[in-house]
Amino acid sequence: MVKSFFITGTDTDVGKTLVARTLLLEFVAHGIQCAGYKPISAGCARTPDGLRNLDAVLLQEAANLSLPYDMVNPYAFEPPIAPHIAASEARDAITLKGLSDGLRQIEQAGAELVVVEGAGGWFLPLDRKHLLSDWVKQENIPVIMVVGAKLGCLNHALLTFAAIRNDNLPVAGWVMNRLYGSMSHYQENLDTLRGLLPAPFLGEIPFVNNPLEADLRGRLDISPLL
């Protein structure tokens, strides 16, 4: 049976792609045939090959299962706005079935493990009736939560964790990502979350100037995920 993990964050721009990419590299190092799946992206660049999202490209490159871009990122939109608004403007529709069909295609392509990266935070609208979290719940995918270390992260992390658990989904682990070179009382914030979050702590991502170019293998403990 193919294993999947869904990467969510306490906010947008907290390092979901960085963590997803790092996890993929770790799984590859363990000899697991894995793929990245970024089903929804906005803010894509126009290229000769079509719309391309940097986050999705990074997942595509980190995986050891070679897949065409459109399989990694089936819903790609150019405007850097909420995806459901971008989809409406493009006269497109993001559907639960479409998301599931994309995941099934990757599974059938030979993946043993799929790292699925969400968009935005946990409650990302797909339209006026559905959320991306509805799909994660439908697929029953264990969740990995990325906490962006900044003022307010305690509340954001606890709210996100509670929302995931309220959807009856397991939190397979969580990661603290240092967004800035310095943060007042960073260690105290981390220690507080380690005491309050009843889920495996997979590790810390240090602050780096070019995070998406950094090789952070060895920073995360994937043993709880294997």
Swiss-Prot record:
Pathway stated in the Swiss-Prot or TrEMBL entry: Cofactor biosynthesis; biotin biosynthesis; biotin from 7,8-diaminononanoate: step 1/2
Pfam family, one: AAA_26
GO molecular function: ATP binding; dethiobiotin synthase activity; magnesium ion binding
GO BP annotation list: biotin biosynthetic process
Domain of life: Bacteria
Localization of this protein: Cytoplasm
Gene Ontology cellular component terms for the protein in this record: cytosol
Catalyses which reaction(s): (7R,8S)-7,8-diammoniononanoate + CO2 + ATP = (4R,5S)-dethiobiotin + ADP + phosphate + 3 H(+)
Binding site residues for ATP: 13-18, 55, 117-120, 177-178, 206-208, 213
Catalytic residues in the record: 38
Annotated EC: 6.3.3.3
Cofactor: Mg(2+)
Family: Belongs to the dethiobiotin synthetase family.
Assembly information from the UniProt record: Homodimer.
NCBIfam families: bioD
Annotated protein name in UniProt: ATP-dependent dethiobiotin synthetase BioD
